[in-house]
Structures are given as C-alpha cells and as structure tokens.
Amino acid sequence: MPNRQEGDRVAHGFPHRAAVGASLTALYRRLSPDGVYRYPVSVPAADVAFGDDEDLHLGTQRVARALVRHLRLPEARMVVSFRSMEHAAAVELAAGPEYFVELNDRFRTRRRDIGAALAHEITHVLLHRLGLGFPDTEENEILTDVVTAYLGAGWLLLDAYRQDGVESQKLGYLTPEEFGYVLAKRAAVFGEDPSPWFTSAVAYEAWGRGRAEADRERTPPPLAGAGWAERRRYGRDRRRGVAAPGAPYAFDGGAPATGVSFLCPVCRQRLRVPAGRPLRARCGVCRTVLECAGWGLPQAPSPPPRWLRARGVGGFRRPRARLRGGYGLSSVLRLLKK
C-alpha cells in the first residue's frame, strides 16, 4: 500500500472511474449478491481503536484479529511486525495458516492509522483466497481498496486522510473522493451512514463529494427517477438514435433507437433493455430490480415543471388572462385606475 505524506501530491476527483466500476462488478460476480450481503455492518470503530496505555504489539494483533473476523477469514495466528520500509504496509500471501503483516515504523507513533493499514493488507489475503484479482498491478490495488470499502472496513482508509498544520497524509490507491464514492455505494445498499465515524475533517468533506457523485448515478436515464431535463435530453437522443457525448447511456437499432444500454447503479454492470416503453429490468449480476421509463416515443414531450412553464421554458408560454371584447387584464386595471 502506498505511503503518501505530502499533501500536494494527493490526487482528487475520480480518475479511476472505470477501474472502480470494474472492481464492483468483479466483487459481485465472485461473491454473488448473497455473499456481499454477508457484510451488512461495517467494522465498529471501537474494535479498531487504540487506547492511550495499550501495548503496541498486543493492540495491533487485537485490531488485526477484529479485521480478520469482520472479513470472515479463518481464525489463525497473527504475526505483525514493524520495520523501516518505503510503503505503508505489506502482507505475505503464503498458503500457511498464519497471517504475516509488516507495518511501516511510523505507525509506532501514529497508532490511530494502524487499523487502516491492516484493513487494506488483510483484504489482500481475502482476495488471494477468493482467487479474485486483475492482471495490472495498479488495477489490482484499486480492486483491494474498493473491496475493503464495500465490505465495511474501508472507512478506516478514508479517515486516515488528513491535511492540517500538523500532518498531511493519505493511505490507499483511491482518491479521497473515490473512497467516499464507494462508501456511498455501500451505504445505499445497506442503509448505513459512515459519517459519524470520521475523525478527519477533510475525510468527511471527501465523503460528501463522493456521495454526491454516487447519488448522481442512482437515477440516470432510462431509469424512472431521472429529472425532467435528463428525460427531455434522453427522448431527443433516442429519436435521433445517437447518445450525446458523455451521456450515461448508448443506443442501438437505428432512429428512433430500439435498444438502450446503461450501467447498473449498484454493481456497474452494463445492461441492455428495449427502448421506448416502460419496463422493469433485473440486473443479472447484483439482482437489483430497476424501473425503466418509456421516454423518447415519437410524441409530444411531457410539459416541464410549473415553475418553468411560468417562465416560458420549453415552448410553453404562460397564458394571459383575456376578457370578452378583446380587453386584457392589464387594460381593465388601467381603466379602473382612471
């Protein structure tokens, strides 16, 4: 796991969007939805916290055992050591019954982040035993961060991100916003709110930005919860048979399009459904049932919201009150003032 301590080197935003989505899909494919649902509760903060007077080695082993239990790995002897190293931590993926984890020497004095480093490394063990991984090293590390967060231990990695006058640090391969994004995806499935667990102010802000991005992906067209402007744009694109650049969907079947594909908002698997009629689709990977609308039919678009109609938006003009004889309301008011 990388060890970044210079705040100006911390990347932000969502540069690994494709790898994060592929990691979520791979996790659901390997574990199945039933396997993912075996992790409904995140690791409690009390189980991974260090007491001021707690022995370093005994406390580290206690936290490691708590993470092993949380990730549903077999109970075994924990061997955790500290040494000078370039990275934050490393783990031995041997087939033996013990778990061998090495931590950077700096964690001797930064005990509150030991749980974050252990969470990433112990997830490596889980993925090794599941036979789940990507050929590319960086993508495999991103997969590890995503699985750590989605199975309920990754909030520790985001909370280890700090930028203040005393220290500046980030653990893991994902950006802070991407950690918040994956945590928000998990929160939407399990009804969990990790925000009370953050002790870092910048981590809380990154969680908010990631949650906003995850919320934006929950109801893209053709899903029924899309907003009025998105529906109107989708209908226009469907009649043309071509999606606009950057649109979260793609069409096929000519113009108007007869099929549309989009990413599942839960597992990011690409789905294809008939276009132009309302239907209910079930994702074959995560089994999420999605309500799809039938926008884009060759008919007049639905009227915009009332507040937009009042401004004459979308071709709808606010009607003026008229009286018989051709007098408008404004004319009558002027006559009454005389």
Which residues make up each language-model segment?
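Hydrophobic or amphipathic, alpha-helical segments that drive membrane association/targeting
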Residues: 1-48
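Pan-zinc metallopeptidase signature
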Residues: 2-18, 22, 170-338
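Auxiliary, metal-adjacent structural segments of Zn-dependent hydrolase domains
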Residues: 32-96, 106-111
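A short, surface-exposed helix-loop junction/capping segment
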Residues: 40-51, 126-127, 243-249
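Short pre-active-site segment immediately N-terminal to the catalytic Zn-binding motif
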Residues: 99-118, 135-139
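Active-site recognition of the HExxH zinc-binding catalytic motif
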Residues: 116-132, 149
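Short acidic, glycine/proline-enriched loop segments that cap or flank alpha-helices
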Residues: 131-136, 274
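Post-HExxH zinc-binding segment in Zn-dependent metallohydrolases
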Residues: 137-172
